[in-house]
């Protein structure tokens, strides 16, 4: 896929990050992962991110990563595009990006580098090294210690034609507005704060009409209903779902650092699509939290 095709896909509808399936001993479960993708594919996401943040990229080994991307590409070929997560140290990010390209992914989401802080010059060098290592499209993720200024993004865009997307996980409205005003349609933009539905209407007003949904992993129909409500400026439906599900869900998610991933795996287990346990240092939800989440899911009706 050409980079501009990835850009078009990014702007065409709801995106999501499938969970990565692990067995009871914590090993990658390829069969379970393929079955998950087969279940989710028909619901209408414009693309799925394999081995993204919700897919616990941070816990994957260099051997597991290619197997996950290959499984996703083979399972979803002809059904839904696969964008691979890639990140960490520059050389490892390049290794992941090249493995994803070889496997047939449609592009990568460049996740934040690991641990160390860096200035804009260093961040730019990191992104450019990854962009230069592949031919397909790259989406840069503005999150954590990887925070980019409009000027840095403009320089990167000028030097790297395959840098076609910008995902924001910071939530700095002034910065987001500045980036959009400077870059315009050079990038496709994606809302990427945890539980992105809560911020979707505000981001749409900033020129970012699409986002990635984590809850699509266990309530895909509701996730699509909410996305269509945002797209159609249906505030009544948005407010109903925010009040009845998303705000109580947010309160439950915020009980523990790392629950942004754990609660999604819990939801998948509740609806009969168990992806196994989360990997340390994440922890699974407690029994009372599982019960509270089940009550929230049950009142939404069939998916």
UniProtKB/Swiss-Prot annotation:
UniProt catalytic activity: 5-dehydro-4-deoxy-D-glucarate + H(+) = 2,5-dioxopentanoate + CO2 + H2O
EC number in record: 4.2.1.41
Family classification: Belongs to the DapA family.
SS bonds (residue pairs): none
Name this protein carries in UniProt: Probable 5-dehydro-4-deoxyglucarate dehydratase
Native species: Paracidovorax citrulli (strain AAC00-1) (Acidovorax citrulli)
Ranges that cross the membrane: none
Matches recorded under Pfam families: DHDPS (PF00701)
Keywords (A to Z) from UniProt: Lyase
UniProt xrefs under PANTHER family: 5-DEHYDRO-4-DEOXYGLUCARATE DEHYDRATASE 2-RELATED (PTHR12128:SF19), DIHYDRODIPICOLINATE SYNTHASE (PTHR12128)
Pathway assigned to this chain's UniProt record: Carbohydrate acid metabolism; D-glucarate degradation; 2,5-dioxopentanoate from D-glucarate: step 2/2
InterPro entries: Aldolase_TIM, DapA-like, Dehydro-deoxyglucarate_dehyd
Keyword Aminoacyl-tRNA synthetase tagged: no
Keyword field contains Iron: no
GO BP annotations, alphabetical order: D-glucarate catabolic process
HAMAP family found in the cross-reference section: KDGDH
GO molecular function terms listed in the Swiss-Prot or TrEMBL record: 4-hydroxy-tetrahydrodipicolinate synthase activity; 5-dehydro-4-deoxyglucarate dehydratase activity
């Amino acid at each position: 896929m050409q980079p501009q095709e990835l850009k078009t896909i990014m702007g065409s509808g709801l995106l999501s990050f499938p969970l990565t399936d692990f067995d009871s001993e914590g090993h990658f479960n390829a069969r379970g992962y393929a079955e998950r993708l087969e279940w989710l594919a028909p619901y209408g996401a414009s693309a799925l991110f394999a081995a993204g943040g919700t897919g616990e990229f941070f816990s994957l080994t260099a051997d597991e990563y290619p197997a996950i991307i290959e499984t996703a590409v083979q399972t979803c070929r002809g059904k839904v595009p696969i964008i691979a997560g890639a990140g960490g140290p520059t050389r490892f990010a390049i290794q992941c990006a090249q493995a994803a390209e070889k496997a047939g992914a449609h592009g990568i989401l460049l996740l934040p580098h690991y641990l160390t802080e860096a200035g804009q010059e260093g961040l730019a060098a990191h992104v450019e090294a990854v962009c230069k290592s592949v031919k397909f499209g790259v989406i840069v993720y503005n999150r954590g210690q990887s925070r980019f200024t409009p000027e840095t993004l403009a320089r990167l865009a000028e030097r790297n034609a395959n840098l076609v997307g910008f995902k924001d996980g910071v939530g700095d409205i002034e910065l987001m507005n500045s980036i959009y005003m400077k870059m315009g349609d050079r990038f496709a933009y994606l809302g990427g704060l945890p539980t992105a539905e809560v911020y979707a209407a505000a981001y749409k007003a900033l020129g970012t009409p699409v986002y990635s949904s984590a809850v699509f992993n266990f309530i895909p129909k509701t996730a699509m209903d909410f996305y269509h409500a945002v797209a159609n400026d249906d505030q009544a439906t948005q407010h109903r779902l925010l009040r009845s599900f998303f705000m109580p869900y947010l309160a439950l998610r915020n009980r523990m650092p790392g629950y942004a991933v754990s609660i999604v795996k819990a939801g998948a287990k509740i609806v009969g699509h168990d992806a196994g346990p989360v990997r340390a240092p994440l922890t699974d939800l407690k029994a009372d939290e599982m019960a509270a989440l089940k009550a929230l899911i049950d009142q939404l009706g069939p998916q």
